[in-house]
Structures are given as structure tokens and as C-alpha cells.
């Protein structure tokens, strides 16, 4: 009996950690950019955006399942695996991730400030400082990992419930949305790649994988749990994406005009008046603050293994990361050109990192006697090729803007 209780307790604890990793990944993906992109694409593609969401979900699952599985089996972080495949590559990926994480965190902290401005009428800078203090407090707590898991889960549920409520008030044409999801009137490759990059690109896909390692979940025996957790992470993101898509579609189908300078806020205001606008403020703050936490945690996890000192002081470095992003936003705002450059480079992280992990999956010195399924290798390779082509294309089109 005592043994059964212990086993049940262990299973519950393990499931809690797996859900924590899933929510950390999902809420890292659901940031200010996620809200804006979803509203903008729905406004332009209308019901056909359902097809874009469907394809991006499939590609996201292929990418994420590969990454988390190989990290768990090897028991090593992404940068360690990359260095074993090609010495020095891990450092290169780590630099890209940290630059991306820092630049996007300036945007995330700005989004959190904007959310509090909508809710309480304070300036975005004051809102950003308050949000930074809240994010820092999570890492000051002794059980920082558990606090982070719990916070991202609560924020995730709040965002989804509020967005579903607003979607219901707009009475979207669900039948039309379902029909267009499978037989679209318009297809946008750019929208698909943008969504995949925003959901599992950059540091985001490693957020949950590295969290599981920190919690001690690794080895071949953990594969079923890790796979389940990786898919749940994508599904949480997708539920939020679909709810927001339906909310925007409901507004668009009524012929109401969405303000292109702030599409997400405009949708909530048109859907539910001033109450809707306040709901947007809370969703924006939740989306931004969880992305601040996810970006800081994951970026630092990429440098942890390079030195025992970094490993020992990782919480202090995470706090420093949040402080630097906040000071950058408060003093210089969002540096547009830097964001363009880093955003372009960010598109290359997923194909480089995933490609490296797929090579690692066949190296005995990294994964032992583990056999990586062929269907995962081939689908992962497909994502690598698609995202590499689009990543290079984006880089070539965005870089000239820096000098214009």
C-alpha cells in the first residue's frame, strides 16, 4: 500500500513537471508578437487562416517532438549536443539564442508595460518596471522552478479562458472557418513560416526540453512522457491561436474595421467594448510576462554548461538578463533596427539547431543504443529544409532595410 502511494505520488510529481515544461514552452511562444501576428493574418486571410494554423500545428509537432526527444534521450542540452556534433557549433547557437532572447525580451517587457497601461492607465515604462519586479521575484524564490511552472500554468489558463470568452461574444462563422481549414480559398506560405518560427523558432522549442532536464526527466525510459509533454505544449499554443483567430474572424465577418496599428487591442475593443479592452490588457500582460520569464530562463540555460560558475549562479544571471532587457526598454525603447536584425537571425536558429539534433540522433556517443524513428527524422528534415529556405529568404529581404 505504501509502495502504491509512493508510485502515485511520483507519477503526479512527474506529470506536474511535464505540464510545467509544456506550459513554459507554450507561454513563451504566446507573446505580444503572437497576438499581433494572429490578428493581422486573420484580418487579411479571413477564414483561410484556419488552414495556415492547421499546417503550422503539424510542422510544430514534427519540430518539437524531435528536439525534446533527442534532448531527453541524450540527457544533454542543445548547445552541448551541437558541440559534440561539430566543435564550436554549440557556442554559435548559444550566441544566436541569447541575442534573440535579449532582443525579444525588450519587446516582451514593453508588451507587459503596455498591458498594465491598458489595465491601470500608467505609463508603459512604469508598467515595464513593475512587470520586471514580478518576473524577478519568481527567480528569487527558493523553489524557482516550481514557482515558474505554476505561474506559467495560471497565466496560460487565464489567457485561454478570456480569449475563448471574447471569441464566443463575437459569434464567428465557425462552419466557414472549419470548411476553409481543409479547403482554403487562399494559401499564404509566408504566414505558415511566420507561425512556425513564432511557435517553435529561436529559443522557444528548447524552453521545455531544457526545463525537463533541469527537473531530472531524461533517458530512453522517459520518451513516452516527453513526447506527450511536447505535443501538449503545441496544443496549448494552438488552442490560444484558434480562440484568437475565431475572435478576430467574428469581428471581421461583421464588416467592422480593425485598426492596423494595434490589431489585437482593436479586436477586443470591437468585440466587447471597454470591458474587452481591459481583457486585452490582461491577456497582453500575461502573454508578455510569461515570455519574459521563458526567454530569460532558456537563454541562460544555453550558457549554463559552459562553466560551473554560470551553473552555480544561473538564477542571478537570469535576474540580470531581465534587468538588462528592462533598462534597455525604459531608456531607449524598442530599437527597431536591432529587432529586425535579430528577428531575421532568429529564423535560422530552428533549422540549424534541429538539423544538428537530427545528425546527433544517429551518433552512438550522444544517444547510445537509441534508435530514432525514421518518420521523425524525415518529418524533422522537412521542417529544417522549409525553415532554412524561408529563414535565408527573410534574412535577404530584411537586412537591406537596416541601411535604408
UniProtKB/Swiss-Prot annotation:
Q: Name one Pfam family in it.
A: Nramp
According to the UniProt record, one GO cellular component term is:
plasma membrane
Membrane topology is: Multi-pass membrane protein
Q: Superkingdom of the source?
A: Bacteria
What is this protein's name? Uncharacterized membrane protein YcsG
| Native organism taxonomy | Bacteria, Bacillati, Bacillota, Bacilli, Bacillales
Query: A Gene Ontology MF term for this entry?
Result: cadmium ion transmembrane transporter activity
Cross-referenced PANTHER family: SOLUTE CARRIER PROTEIN FAMILY 11 MEMBER (PTHR11706), TRANSPORTER PROTEIN (PTHR11706:SF2)
Kindly state a single biological-process term from the GO annotations of this entry. iron ion transmembrane transport
Q: Which organism is it from?
A: Bacillus subtilis (strain 168)
Amino acid at each position: 500500500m505504501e509502495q502504491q502511494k509512493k508510485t502515485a505520488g511520483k507519477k503526479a510529481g512527474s506529470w506536474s513537471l511535464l505540464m510545467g515544461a509544456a506550459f513554459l514552452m507554450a507561454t513563451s511562444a504566446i507573446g505580444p508578437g503572437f497576438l499581433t501576428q494572429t490578428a493581422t493574418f486573420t484580418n487579411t486571410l479571413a477564414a483561410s487562416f484556419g488552414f495556415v494554423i492547421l499546417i503550422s500545428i503539424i510542422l510544430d509537432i514534427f519540430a518539437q517532438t524531435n528536439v525534446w526527444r533527442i534532448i531527453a534521450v541524450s540527457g544533454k542540452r542543445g548547445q552541448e549536443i551541437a558541440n559534440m556534433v561539430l566543435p564550436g557549433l554549440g557556442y554559435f547557437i548559444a550566441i544566436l539564442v541569447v541575442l534573440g532572447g535579449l532582443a525579444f525580451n525588450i519587446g516582451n517587457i514593453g508588451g507587459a508595460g503596455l498591458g498594465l497601461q491598458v489595465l491601470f492607465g500608467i505609463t508603459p515604462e512604469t508598467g515595464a518596471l513593475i512587470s520586471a519586479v514580478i518576473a524577478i521575484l519568481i527567480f528569487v524564490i527558493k523553489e524557482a522552478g516550481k514557482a515558474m511552472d505554476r505561474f506559467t500554468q495560471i497565466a496560460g489558463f487565464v489567457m485561454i479562458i478570456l480569449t475563448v470568452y471574447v471569441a464566443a461574444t463575437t459569434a464567428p462563422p465557425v462552419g466557414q472557418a472549419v470548411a476553409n481549414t481543409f479547403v482554403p480559398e487562399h494559401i499564404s506560405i509566408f504566414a505558415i513560416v511566420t507561425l512556425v518560427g513564432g511557435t517553435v523558432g529561436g529559443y522557444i522549442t528548447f524552453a521545455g526540453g531544457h526545463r525537463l532536464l533541469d527537473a531530472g526527466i531524461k533517458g530512453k525510459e522517459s520518451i513516452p512522457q516527453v513526447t506527450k509533454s511536447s505535443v501538449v505544449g503545441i496544443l496549448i499554443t494552438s488552442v490560444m491561436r484558434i480562440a484568437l483567430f475565431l475572435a478576430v474572424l467574428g469581428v471581421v465577418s461583421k464588416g467592422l474595421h480593425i485598426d492596423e496599428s494595434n490589431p489585437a487591442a482593436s479586436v477586443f475593443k470591437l468585440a466587447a467594448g471597454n470591458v474587452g479592452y481591459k481583457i486585452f490588457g490582461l491577456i497582453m500582460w500575461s502573454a508578455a510576462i510569461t515570455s519574459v520569464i521563458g526567454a530569460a530562463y532558456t537563454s541562460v540555460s544555453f550558457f549554463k554548461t559552459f562553466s560551473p560558475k554560470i551553473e552555480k549562479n544561473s538564477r542571478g544571471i537570469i535576474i540580470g538578463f531581465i534587468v538588462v532587457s528592462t533598462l534597455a526598454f525604459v531608456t531607449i525603447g524598442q530599437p527597431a533596427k536591432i529587432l529586425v536584425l535579430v528577428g531575421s537571425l532568429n529564423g535560422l536558429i530552428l533549422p540549424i539547431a534541429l538539423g544538428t539534433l537530427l545528425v546527433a540522433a544517429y551518433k552512438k556517443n550522444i544517444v547510445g543504443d537509441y534508435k530514432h524513428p525514421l518518420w521523425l527524422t524525415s518529418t524533422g528534415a522537412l521542417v529544417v529544409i522549409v525553415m532554412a529556405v524561408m529563414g535565408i529568404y527573410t534574412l535577404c529581404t530584411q537586412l537591406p532595410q537596416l541601411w535604408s
